[in-house]
Amino acid sequence: MKTPWELLKESKTKIKTTWRIAFVSALVLGLLIHLPVMLSDIPNHDGLGSMYFDQNMITSGRWFLTVACGFSSYFTIPWVIGLIGLIWLALTAAVLTEVLELKDPVTITVVSGLLVSFPALASTFAYVFTMDGYMLALFLAVLAVLFTAKYPRGYLAGAVCLAFSMGIYQAYL
């Protein structure tokens, strides 16, 4: 049995440098950009009724949203939900570098920065009570593209990822 430190050392050699750059730059830039929202709870029209919300939105076709938002809490805790959402977003940036076959660290950082600061995505932070689920949906949608583009029968895994993404939030189709 390996110790956690040995597993960490092994994982460092297995994770591509481009993925690490994308993940870290998206996480750091995301924190810098979205920290004010994560540290305060300024509810919008939906947020007022969602201080505790189990995200059971099956009538809207969001059959997987309850599970996706269940990783954090059904309570609106902006910094927890925001951090989990940023981790999903950073993973999306890493997958995006693979899809776009980016190699240059500056380009990777710029693409990661554009991803976390894009206005349509930044407005999702106003709906902080569902943000972690929505960021998981984005991750699954980009992962579906990666599987479909890179692997011979990747469309099968891509279809599963896309189905779960659509079960969370249909806008990322």
Regions found by a protein language model. Give the residues of each.
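Membrane-interface transmembrane helices that cradle and orient dolichyl/undecaprenyl
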Residues: 141-155
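Transmembrane-helix motifs of polytopic, lipid-linked glycan transferases
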Residues: 83-109
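Membrane-interface alpha helices of multi-pass inner-membrane proteins
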Residues: 155-171
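Aromatic- and kink-enriched transmembrane "portal" helix at the membrane-lumen/periplasm boundary
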Residues: 111-140, 167
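Transmembrane signal-anchor helices characteristic of membrane glycosylation enzymes that use polyprenol
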Residues: 14-42
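Short hydrophobic/aromatic helix or loop-helix immediately within or flanking a transmembrane segment
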Residues: 55-79, 83-88
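Short, Lys/Arg-rich, polar N-terminal cytosolic tail immediately upstream
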Residues: 1-15
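Extracytoplasmic catalytic/substrate-binding loops of multi-pass membrane glycan-assembly enzymes
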Residues: 32-50, 56-67
